[in-house]
A protein has these predicted regions:
Chain B
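Amphipathic alpha-helical interaction surfaces in cytosolic regulatory modules
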Residues: 19-46, 51-101
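Short acidic, hydrophobic short linear motifs in intrinsically disordered regions
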Residues: 132-145
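Short alpha-helical segments that sit at the start of domains
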Residues: 98-129, 154
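Domain-start "cap" segments at the beginnings of catalytic or binding domains
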Residues: 1-24
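Short helix-capping/hinge SLiMs at alpha-helix to coil transitions
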Residues: 40-41, 130-134
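Short, cationic-aromatic polyanion-contact patches
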Residues: 119-120, 167-178
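Short amphipathic alpha-helical interaction segments
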Residues: 146-161
């Protein structure tokens, strides 16, 4: 038997739970087919979520899943230019014609879908982002020049969470696009996802006790994002997320972290998301999304 | 004597690649180990860490390089930073405040250092006074700032503990920066 999991037509953090629910009990016992034929658009968060599912199935020693590529030539070309198919080919048996990826991605892809497995990869990511980030953040989003370096720092810290906590590799992608309905402004989105142990298991040995019966995916996210705790006893740890929150507050940005069955967000005034969502469909590892909006005239 | 350590050079040795970004904890730890090894082979008491050819310093690396270096060498060396840009300041200041540590940093084209990190307000004022006036004893600081002797002594003691002044006899010397 094959379990068919449909990729939402418009696949981003909001439709992610529909995708996660498709897997049922994790890991699914049947062969998996991820069906993206009807997909019209996917955010970087959506693209790396598909890869994370493929990686998690491989690590659970399940049969190699199938992936049917989008029917739309435009969508396929975009995914190819974002580097998605290069990575997906290792994890999925691809079905459907895949366009060859161009030499360079579209101008609003700041960072192709990039694997992060070791700290050397973080160096590569930060090095690669530095040129395009200034053009988008300062040129398009009207952020001050020093924002570019803060942005790179945030990206570095987010990627290091994979290396230090996941216990396996992950993915990162960065893209600029327009939030028409939610905000009506350009945004830059950093998406980071891994198929690792997740926040609850990572923090359990050091912090579960003081939460008592409350301990779970939601409490673990709260400990990490709100209380800035780390699984390491080193007192210098846990500052990365604290710093990211500080500068996102200044730019009215948003961070949300989903791990296991919970999602916690620091919600800016322009968004209507709920801060904490619990009892969500399980999905392996952790998924982080950071959104930085273009600055309005008054806040320049 | 001052020993100048070019951070860009150490970074390239540590990662074996031409990157100019001080990022990740393993990289920071590798760079710090090289700084410690370098200092162990010199007779100098002051290490001037030159960040001029560093593009980005992230928090993890600032913690591994600067905070842990200060924690490790607290009894042995004076550490001064130079060639920092504003965003470097921000990362280093953030991690040092977290640890309640402080370091002197020399701005570009200046010999007058500023403090990054955490010290009590009196110690910060005393640091500025010693850096500007040159060597002072407790009485001299009291006179310059209009403080009681006890208040001045406390501020200078704190700077001494943080290795932000060099006590010699009754005098407290500013850290050498050139």
């Amino acid at each position: 038997m094959t379990r068919v999991i449909e990729v939402p037509t418009h696949f981003d953090d909001r439709s992610f739970d529909t995708f996660a629910a498709g897997f049922g009990e994790w890991p699914p016992s049947e062969k998996v087919l991820v069906d993206a034929r009807a997909t019209q658009w996917a955010s970087p968060y959506g693209l790396i979520a598909i890869l994370t599912a493929g990686q998690a199935l491989a690590e659970a020693k399940r049969e190699k899943p199938l992936l049917t590529v989008p029917t739309s030539d435009e969508v396929k070309r975009y995914w190819a230019r974002a580097g998605f198919f290069n990575q997906a080919a290792e994890l999925f048996e691809l079905h459907g014609k895949v366009p060859r990826s161009g030499a360079t991605g579209p101008s609003d892809v700041l960072l192709d879908v990039t694997p992060v497995r070791a700290s050397e990869d973080v160096h590569g990511v930060v090095h690669k982002i530095s040129e395009g980030a200034s053009r988008i953040l300062h040129g398009e989003l009207r952020l001050e020049m020093k924002a570019t370096l803060r942005f790179s720092m945030a990206l570095s810290e987010a990627c290091q969470n994979i290396v230090e906590h996941a216990g396996t590799g992950g993915w990162v992608a960065v893209q600029a696009y327009t939030f028409r309905r939610r905000l009506g402004r350009r945004v830059v989105v950093i998406a980071v996802s891994d198929a690792g142990v997740g926040f609850r298991r990572s923090l359990e040995s050091a912090h579960a006790k003081r939460f008592g019966d409350r301990w779970g995916d939601g409490a673990a996210l709260e400990a990490a994002l709100i209380q800035n705790v780390s699984r390491f006893r080193d007192p210098g740890r846990g500052q990365g997320l604290a710093f990211i929150k500080r500068f996102l507050d200044q730019w009215e940005g948003k961070i949300s972290i989903r791990s296991g069955t919970a999602r916690l967000s620091i919600v800016p005034p322009w968004d209507e998301d709920v801060p904490m969502s619990d009892h969500l469909p399980y999905f392996p590892g952790a998924q982080v999304q950071i959104i930085i909006p273009a600055q309005e005239e008054k806040s320049r | 004597m001052i020993y100048t350590i070019r951070m860009g050079l150490l970074l390239r040795e540590a990662v074996s690649a031409p990157y100019r970004n001080l990022v990740t904890r393993p990289t920071g730890a590798a760079v710090r180990t090289r700084i410690e090894a370098t200092l162990a082979n010199t007779q100098c008491l002051t290490a001037l860490l030159d960040f001029s050819d560093i593009e980005l310093v992230d928090l993890s690396c600032a913690d591994e390089v600067v905070a842990k270096l200060l924690l490790t060498v607290r009894t042995a060396y004076f550490v001064v930073l130079q060639g920092l840009r504003e965003d470097h300041h921000e990362a280093i200041d953030h991690v040092l405040r977290h640890h309640r540590l402080a370091v002197a940093a020399v701005p570009p084209n200046s010999h007058a250092p500023r403090l990054l990190g955490w010290v009590a307000p009196d110690a910060r004022e005393a640091f500025a006074c010693v850096s500007e006036s040159g060597p002072l004893d407790v009485t001299g600081l009291s006179r310059d700032l209009g403080w009681s002797v006890a208040r001045s002594r406390e501020a200078l003691d704190e700077l001494t503990v943080h290795r932000l002044v060099r006590p010699f006899g009754d005098l407290y010397y500013p850290l050498p920066t050139a």
